[in-house]
């Protein structure tokens, strides 16, 4: 199975180049921008209209922190499913024998959607990701995996979630997919990473760069399983 992983399109989805020969496309969140859910809703619906028309048999969407209209249920799971899109929110799906888990949650940072305090995330992951699977899709990265950014004092930091990293290293799925942390200044987060001594490939599918919205700086990642 050939998979196209994309994330953080932030309304620029129509700038993507659609690769050939893809069996499954997975978008790991942030198709939209506005914090206000009523302003956010039209952007998510515009994305759905584009996503449903992709010439790819299987399509998965996992929401991100900018997708406030989904958190508030102005856009629902049924809205995705009625358009042939699988929406995952702390649940599994199996496609052609490949078992996939998806969750929108990220560590708290401001007042955005699907965010939880880091102290609560470990319990959430352990309860939600309770079965072995081939692919884990979460909006945000595990700690130390394509997750670098700058804090308010311009110091580089690793923004990912440690409890998610621990769980992934315990379970070792074939792939761990995420976005959320974009390329930033001289930091390249988009791409793939494999940690020494472990089998899992980590994929940051974000396609934009902070401070350079309006164009794409990545076209996502191609995976095979």
Give the positions of each predicted feature.
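Binuclear metal-dependent hydrolase catalytic cores centered on His/Asp/Glu-rich metal-binding motifs
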Residues: 98-135, 153-166
């Amino acid at each position: 199975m050939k998979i196209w992983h994309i994330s953080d399109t932030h309304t620029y989805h129509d700038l993507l180049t659609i690769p050939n020969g893809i069996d499954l496309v997975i978008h790991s969140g942030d198709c939209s921008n506005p914090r206000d859910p009523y302003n956010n809703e039209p952007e998510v619906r515009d994305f759905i209209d584009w996503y449903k028309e992709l010439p790819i048999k299987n399509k998965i969407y996992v929401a991100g922190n900018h997708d406030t209209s989904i958190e508030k249920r102005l856009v629902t799971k049924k809205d995705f499913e009625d358009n042939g899109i699988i929406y995952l929110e702390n649940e599994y799906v199996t496609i052609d024998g490949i078992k996939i888990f998806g969750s929108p949650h990220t560590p708290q940072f401001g007042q955005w959607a699907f965010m939880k305090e880091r102290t609560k995330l470990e319990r959430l992951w352990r309860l939600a990701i309770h079965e072995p699977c081939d692919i884990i899709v979460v909006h945000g990265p595990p700690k130390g995996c394509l997750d670098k950014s700058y804090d308010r004092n311009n110091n580089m930091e690793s923004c990912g979630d440690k409890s998610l990293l621990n769980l992934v290293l315990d379970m070792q799925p074939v792939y761990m997919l995420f976005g959320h942390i974009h390329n930033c200044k001289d930091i390249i987060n988009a791409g793939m990473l494999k940690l020494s001594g472990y089998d899992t490939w980590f994929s940051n599918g974000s396609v934009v760069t902070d401070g350079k919205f309006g164009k794409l700086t990545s076209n996502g990642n191609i995976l095979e399983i």
